[in-house]
Amino acid sequence: MAPRKKAVTKKKTVEKSPPIEEEIIEEPVDEIVESDGDDKKNKKKGKRKSSKKSKKEKEENVEEEEQDQEEEEEGNKKQKEENDADKKSRKHDEHRKKRDSKNRRSHSKSDENEEGEEDDEERRKKRRRRKHREKRKKNGNKEEEEEEEQDDEHEDQNVEEDEEDVNVEKQKQQQQQSDFDEEEKEEEKEEEEEEEQIEIKKRSKKRNSIDSGRKDKSKKRKSKKKKRGQNDDDDDDDDNDDDDDDQDEEKEYEQDEDVNQESIVSEKEEEEDEEKQSQGSEDEEKQSENERRNDQDYTDRERERNRSRDRDSRDYSSRSDHRDYRDRDRDRSRDRDRDYRDSRDYRDRDRDYRDRDRDHYSSGGSSSSSRDHRDHRDRDYRDRDRDHRDRSRDRDRDHYSSSSGSSSNRRSRDRDNDSKRDEKSSSSNNSNNSTSTTSNNNASSNNVKIVQPPKENFFSNYRAIQSSIIPTHNKSKFGERILSIAPTEPPPNFQIPLSKPYRDDSLQQNNDNNNNSSNNNSNNSNNNFNNDNNPYNNSNNYNMNNSNTSPYNNSNNSNSNSSYYNDNDYNNNNNNNNNSNNNNNNNNNNNNNNNNNNNNNNNNFNNSNSNSSESKPNYFNNLSNVFNQITKPLENYKNNGKNENNNNNNNKNKNEDEKRIDLVQTKLSLKSSKSTPQTYNEKEFKVQISNIVVKKLKKYYKTKITTKEDFQYLGKKFTDFVITKERGNQTINKDSEKKIEKVIDNYFEKKEVYDRKKDKDYKKDDGDKLINSSIDISNDSNLSESSITITSTSTSTSTSALTSPKTTGTTTSTITTVTSTSTSSIENTKILVDDEKFKTNIQNETSKESNSI
């Protein structure tokens, strides 16, 4: 063998190597003895000792390696002998398995489990014994049975002795598990009986098909066995036994023919029963699937009904809410489309279309056939689109129609359609604008340019198209058709039917102002506020003082007197304390005066729950805003050197002053007013801010503000500060109160007690103006713990940006608050309003300080 030769060569090399090392080591020893010097001798001695130790270690290592190699060789020899024996036994076992599987057809795969080859042999022997016993019982040969049983026992003993020599280790394991083997054997016996019954049935089936060629196969088997017997001398006894078994099996086949017929009949009956059971189970499954589908359909319908009810119950109160609902509806429609897409009908129908396309269009052909295929395909696509349309229409009908609430469903559907239409129109306008800016202006381009029409076309100054405009020699059928379609009379003007006493007279006032503004800028006191550069141009808004629309007034007015006030701060020629009415026509007469004198009167506005019987209904609160929205875009057209509009405005009839505004514009303004913040006039804005400042300063009263005069001065100071910081912005948002509160808190954060005399901004000359003359302050009852009278004033000088440089004005608002020492909460707020005709005391109940913001 090759590995043995290598081991021998290693031994030779190891034997030659030590003497070479001895020669190398002996030479320096002689030199060391002859050399002088003690240091050198000591060093050489150390080297000599180390060399001797290394020599001994090497010799020991070589001996250990030789011993290991010898042990390995012996182990290899033993393993080879064992492997040879195992190979022989394996060959015999494999031969037996092949022979049994081909000839006997009795062993199933369950016999070849992990139990080992020994268990298989024992089973085979036991089966043989059982067969012989059954045969002998039939023949009545009991004596032979006893003899054969004894022979079998002797054979078993011999076999066990042979197996003990070969498989010593396996027997040790079996001895440890002897307790478990007995139980397993009992179970194995039961399994063997069941397997035999199954094998008998299988054999009966095979016999019917293999009766004709059985004899030929048996002859071939015998010839093969003879050849194998010559090659395998050790297995002669087993071969003889197998031949006997084959003969016995042939006899069994003849005896079991009757049994086979009965088994076949029984098997057929069992198969029929199984088929019936399988059919019954399939029917049950179909019924369960149908029930499940019906339940699903019912739940889907209920879901859709609930969705429609939820959608109808919503209130589209503002645009932001409407936008949210629109997004939700869009998501729901997508979910609904997905449900329909996943439904069975949809999938089956699309599958039919797809299969038809594959069958019709996949195969090629001539031009005529391809043309037919193309027509057929187009027809199919048309049918498919029609089906999609019908499905979407049915889906919308199911969505918007229900047993109850059909009108509300119709309303929600109309809302959805309106919103979609608005989106489409806005997108189309944006696309038109973008294309007009980006496209090149070529002379040959026939793009239609949309020019904004003049202001006249909005108001019944309509002219019919004249046929003389188009020249006669260039007339065509298309032009004649246009002239035949063109109207000859002006279209009807759809207007709001309002009675005269309740119409919006601000329109008349605006027309009067326009007539006067072309001649003089100083004719009216209101002309100072009609300029485009003036940020306080709010003279046209007369209906914005309604306490219902103001977020800062907590009163609930059912009448509209609070929405009208006399704008007397800027037109005081007639001494409004003597002659003032609540009628707008008188105000218009006052507005057209030529004097610019402004009297410093305390003109308090009406912000109350007035219970007057003669009050205007608050139907149209924001008509003036709508009119401004219509007229402002047309100012550019009017100012481009075209005086036709001015001439037309000057030559208008008196009936044109009583024009109404379209319904569509009013609806848009009413919707937009809900979401937009509240805007005020200059006078209103001052008073609203003073109210907020007083409300926030109340928190520091009696803690850091000790006197009433200090409180009044601080109210004036903070109102002026806020107005100057706003720089013409007269809108009050939700965040305005928070901003003012933050400013006041930062001011009092580092101060313990406030004294106005130490304040740099305070002037001694202004002390008399802080206190309102209409209130008696001399009494000490007003300064008691139970009630405190507070007046907050706001003044404007020529240097401030609140008014124009030519005019000065003062506004005051007197507020009476009743507070308690423990909670310091407002119980009542009184706004005293001085007017020529209306003098009322208003009480507004408010919540505690924590809930006031």
Curated annotation (Swiss-Prot):
Stored Pfam families: SRI
Record's compositionally biased regions (Acidic residues): 20-37, 60-74, 112-121, 143-166, 179-197, 232-260, 268-286
Domain of life: Eukaryota
Biased composition (Basic and acidic residues): 75-87, 287-361, 370-400, 411-425
Bias kind Low complexity: ranges: 426-447, 510-613, 636-652
UniProt biased composition (Basic residues): 1-11, 42-55, 88-107, 124-139, 216-228
GO cellular component entries: chromosome
Coiled coil residues, start to end: none
GO biological process, one term: regulation of DNA-templated transcription
Segments for region (Disordered): 1-448, 485-621, 635-658
Name of this protein: Uncharacterized protein DDB_G0283697
Originating species: Dictyostelium discoideum
